[in-house]
Amino acid sequence: MILLHFVYSLWALLLIPLTNAEEFTPKVTKTIAQDSFDILSFDDSNTLIRKQDTSVTISFDDGETWEKVEGIEGEITWIYIDPFNRHDRAVATAMNGSYLYITNDQGKSWERITLPDSGESISPRECYIETHPLNKNYFLAKCNYCEKTEVNNDNEENSGDEEGQFEIFNITRCTDKVFASNDGGKSFSEIKSSLERNENSPISISDCGFAKTSKDSDLESSDTSIICLFQNMQLIMDEFSSPYTESKLVLTTDWGKSLKEFDQFKDKVVNGYRILKSHMVVLTQGDRYNDMSSMDVWVSNDLSNFKMAYMPTQLRHSMQGEIYEDAMGRIILPMSRERSDQEEDKGIVSEILISDSQGLKFSPIPWTANEVFGYINFYQPTYLKGTMIASLYPLSRRRNRKGKAKGVKSKGVTKISVDNGLTWTMLKVVDPDNADSFDCDITDFENCSLQNMFYTREGSTPTAGILMTTGIVGDGSVFDWGDQRTFISRDGGLTWKLAFDFPCLYAVGDYGNVIVAIPYNADEDDDPQSEFYYSLDQGKTWTEYQLETTIYPNEVMNTTPDGSGAKFILNGFTLAHMDGTTNFIYAIDFSTAFNDKTCEENDFEDWNLAEGKCVNGVKYKIRRRKQDAQCLVKKVFEDLQLFETACDKCTEADYECAFEFVRDATGKCVPDYNLIVLSDVCDKTKKKTVPVKPLQLVKGDKCKKPMTVKSVDISCEGVPKKGTNDKEIVVTENKFDFKIQFYQYFDTVTDESLLMINSRGEAYISHDGGQTIKRFDSNGETIIEVVFNPYYNSSAYLFGSKGSIFSTHDRGYSFMTAKLPEARQLGMPLDFNAKAQDTFIYYGGKNCESILSPECHAVAYLTNDGGETFTEMLDNAIHCEFAGSLFKYPSNEDMVMCQVKEKSSQTRSLVSSTDFFQDDKNTVFENIIGYLSTGGYIIVAVPHENNELRAYVTIDGTEFAEAKFPYDEDVGKQEAFTILESEKGSIFLHLATNLVPGRDFGNLLKSNSNGTSFVTLEHAVNRNTFGYVDFEKIQGLEGIILTNIVSNSDKVAENKEDKQLKTKITFNEGSDWNFLKPPKRDSEGKKFSCSSKSLDECSLHLHGYTERKDIRDTYSSGSALGMMFGVGNVGPNLLPYKECSTFFTTDGGETWAEVKKTPHQWEYGDHGGILVLVPENSETDSISYSTDFGKTWKDYKFCADKVLVKDITTVPRDSALRFLLFGEAADIGGSSFRTYTIDFRNIFERQCDFDITGKESADYKYSPLGSKSNCLFGHQTEFLRKTDENCFIGNIPLSEFSRNIKNCSCTRQDFECDYNFYKANDGTCKLVKGLSPANAADVCKKEPDLIEYFESSGYRKIPLSTCEGGLKLDAPSSPHACPGKEKEFKEKYSVSAGPFAFIFISILLIIFFAAWFVYDRGIRRNGGFARFGEIRLGDDGLIENNNTDRVVNNIVKSGFYVFSNIGSLLQHTKTNIAHAISKIRGRFGNRTGPSYSSLIHDQFLDEADDLLAGHDEDANDLSSFMDQGSNFEIEEDDVPTLEEEHTSYTDQPTTTDVPDTLPEGNEENIDRPDSTAPSNENQ
């Protein structure tokens, strides 16, 4: 019994601590305050401070009691603890910013620091202090001043003359000022910006910082070294709305008295910098005129020498403030995603790049590199060496809308690494007690693990491996806020257990032995009051503490930042009143837990980081309290101690790949050709190979015995040497086991995003021009179609094989997934509203068990919310257009037009509606072949009798007019026509005249401004069976068109010969045509074999549109003005493609040069500043490039093995310096598809200096396009062009900058023939035989406000021409009154009789008085008229009494001589004519009638009257077209010579460009009903 009693007593004694623990209740003290947030702790103290409304309050007892700080005046906007003096210093900033308060004794006393007068007219908006890690007296005060101002946009010098000028924003004017102090704020001196600021720079930034940012800084710098970045920004308004930036990065060591600029960045735009422990990182903007351009990263460890780091992708939106350095000296570089229009997506981290230990080679987290694009959470606790936790979530999942996400399985994933990222594992849930509460098998770690979502630094308080987080257990496919729970880990994050079924805020104390958690939602426990939970056994058990109020928790924190204390602050708020919040601040004290017991030695255990493995050459361990120990550590204000033991042997984990090597799929370091090019290993040898060690010891690794690393021989063949431009070219290669079937760029300047589809129907996205390519997760659906929105450049739609539609409005960064209507996909393209991004029409098949089912028919479905919901709009519709959004002046903005084909009918009708066919439905045409829209017109093809077509045109959707084609002798039935382009108020159309397959050709036509009246520009223009035409309008230049004609069209039509093609060019939009002038010598300096001076026999011919593999590969580029490439030959006709060479022009086609002997593919970059050629249809390992506009060419080897390049491409604007090659190479076991991204950014020394007002500068000059200053469209134009080949242009719309030197006199080239007139071989416009001019009075019907009209002269002025004076070939006839407007017409031209009669009578009276005076004084008193015959010169018989008499007599004598000479001349002429007639009759006998010689241009004006006599109806009376007061002489430059130009005056017409609205081609074809042409023609 005694023994039993003893055991019972002992058990009772052991139970006492546990009972005390269970019964323990923390001390909770409540404080109520108004608008109080951000409670701050002084390190190693019991003092807290917080801002309450606009004042500062302080607590000296861990938050139990608070008092207002006395001595602080004014309104306080911000308080913060000095990061380098956390124990005792804090700063409070005032609202007006001209002063602040500082404490150096934990808030007991505050000193007011007054900042110096900045010289600005206003007080600073805000100021804050930056301190020094080593010297408490060193301050940098940074202040921001803003005031609203109006920026003057006017530029009198340039106004009206130069086009494309930028407009400066009116914006708030802001300036940064930096003041430095070395005496604790007693005095300051300003560090003034070294940039001059002008009135157009509304933003001036000064960002300065001490070069030492930590007490253990490794940077080689003095304590007084200060780095400053000065920037001036000018916001420019163009279509990109992008700021222009100039910058200077400087160093000062004397507090701003002298500034030393970093030479390496003098010609660069520094976007930002970051000073780390052992590195300084500088980010430079690739393009100063595009703040969204890619950036380069420069790294230095001595503030003197900077090296450019290698980036695996484009860095565009770095989060500079988040760049930091880990314990191994590696730079962690977060990249934010593009600036989305979606507010919730802004500022989200999208990718984490980690450098090697040298800071020079960056790479992404390995398991995220090839996954779908998403956003990343990244956390690296400094007290857990080598530990990283990262979460990746695809943005496609984030953008799913409610009710539409059921079928979406886009998976996110969270992983952890405990060895510095060498290996990664899932966050394992090891919790058998709660296994049944999860929806998946937690023992299957790969498919059931903890997924973390939020970008927060969980567990930032140091603990011995005890972490908490919120998340969801699953495979990552479902993640919703309501599903989150709270989890805890005791092994540094490797395994986790469930803590709560709801998400919580949490904090830890006593090194993790005390944990406090509070639910975000007070209703989690089914009562309205809030509560918090606490654990005293490292999360094993939890106790609830009930609060009496419902609060929204804002923060919970340990009062000791090092996590050593056991006191906490909980700050929550309620929305008690409209003006602000009521805060409830709870001080929670656990210091007396376990009866105030302090842990002893046997209460502790060792916990090993990374499961005891070596990390950084060291094994780490922490002494921590055992989980069930009934005590607290109570080492308040002592930092958590980490014990380390160096590892004896180094392993591969202690090494990283050398710069020239990358890890392959197996983790082995293998040579990378592109990195070898960037390094200098081959610069030091002349041998073909060089030995290099593939591994290097990680900087800072502490393992004792290094490994033996064997060198690998690297090939140096083809590697450029240092000092050459080729050394700076960066190539990135990607290999695939599939072929890319489709690709297309998004046409924006934000980045170089493109979408690709492979042969398996998988979609891939790249945002850096193909450098990195990531697969799009389509949830297992094959992508069967891709549609880009032609009106919104960031939008595209992907169709899945299972009925899903994936839409993106941010160039593929995020996708919204929706289900298409329950209808069969017919493969018809979407039709978009030009003015509403989310509105489009989808076509699906209804009742289509089979596509051949009798009841299967098409239905047009309408969506107004981007595909979230669809409604049936119209049955049997196969093509609709939002007509109201297309017209400039629509009759109704909501009008929709649809082509309808009833199942029971073989015809198609055109219907319209203004309410999406709910109640309004109007039949426009009952029977059509098809219709299309282009350039503000809608053109409808209507069948006519005898299998002909007729075209009708509308410009408002209501009024349709028949398109009148010219009557011509060689035009038969109108069986097929192709709409080529509509621009500048005219439609270009190809009317087929021969439709025999393989022998197709036709006439090129051009319309008037409303598209209803066409004239022939050129005959026998080549087309193919698909309706495509050899026609291309040169981009960026007015009126230049290239076309191929069938020179032997008559014999081709008779089936006697195959086509023989010739290339023609026009410089005035088809009015006149010439053959291309051939170069005199080829690319080898040899003369061409054909040497005829006649261009008809020897000219340059180019392969055209009908032969292209990719119709996007045009001759020209809209940004490279005047430049064109083409594959062709010099000779009488065009030769087969393989026999041709590559030619180039820089003056819009006036002169050409051969650049390559074989066919090459080409691409333009940097607005023509970089040109690239690659062989076509032959394997190669090199490209040719030019940086001097094609004058010289260099070859560059871009890969080690030869590949067959399928295509070369770049961004649609041709403004980038990066090109993408698609190639195919033979590999063992088959072929592999490859892409090569070739980056030329670094070959240029600098960016060209551009004046945003368009003025000339050292790098840009205005010059004419060609070799002569010819007039084109009635004016002489000069274009702004780069003059220095060593600089690059960048994001400047250079093609928009031009200026008109003068308007020229009108010449024949400024006119074209009017309707029913044709251009004869002599260049004149003649009326078609048997026809009359068009009824000129029709214009009155179209324009009811007109009161008069004019008859046609046969000519009309080309719409683009601005000529003045000169020829008036389109001079109107006398005006005629419009029908019904006779009264107004008379009022306009009638003249009042009163004033006219007065003037007339006055003139008559003056004449009569003068005549009577002369007669009376000079004739009558001198003898009258009888004496006329007696007057002789010098006769002194006349009466002359005064000067008046002498003047009158002289007048009389002069009159006498004039009249007598006229009489004599008439008599003499009569006699000579009689003699001449007699001689002619005798010599020529019976020959009668005039004889005319052939007219050439030099004779045009001189012989016009003779030539055109008797042909007034042909509009050839030039005398009425000339300005009576003008000089009619035509200069030599204005009139071509017969030898050069006469061949252009044929009876053949011209061709036109491809409409921009078509996704694949720029041509639309409308054919006859019985045509055999393929389906891309409207039949």
From Swiss-Prot:
Record's keyword annotation contains Signal: yes
Low complexity bias locations: 1546-1559
A GO molecular-function descriptor: vacuolar sorting signal binding
GO CC, any one term: Golgi apparatus
Assigned keywords, A-Z: Glycoprotein, Golgi apparatus, Membrane, Nucleotide-binding, Protein transport, Receptor, Repeat, Signal, Transmembrane, Transmembrane helix, Transport
Region spans: Disordered: 1533-1579
Signal peptide as annotated in the record: 1-21
Protein's GO biological process: Golgi to endosome transport; Golgi to vacuole transport; mitophagy; pexophagy; protein targeting to vacuole; vacuolar transport; vesicle targeting, trans-Golgi to endosome
Glycan-linked positions: N96, N170, N447, N793, N1010, N1303
Parts of the chain that traverse the membrane: 1398-1414
Lumenal side: 22-1397
Subcellular location: Golgi apparatus, trans-Golgi network membrane; Prevacuolar compartment membrane
UniProt keyword annotation of Ribosomal protein present: no
Cytoplasmic side: 1415-1579
Family as reported in the entry's similarity comment: Belongs to the VPS10-related sortilin family.
Role of this protein: Functions as a sorting receptor in the Golgi compartment required for the intracellular sorting and delivery of soluble vacuolar proteins, like carboxypeptidase Y (CPY) and proteinase A. May execute multiple rounds of sorting by cycling between the late Golgi and a prevacuolar endosome-like compartment. Binds the Golgi-modified P2 form of CPY, and this interaction is dependent on the presence of an intact CPY vacuolar protein sorting signal.
Additional remark text: Present with 7210 molecules/cell in log phase SD medium.
Protein name: Vacuolar protein sorting/targeting protein VPS10
Gene label: PEP1
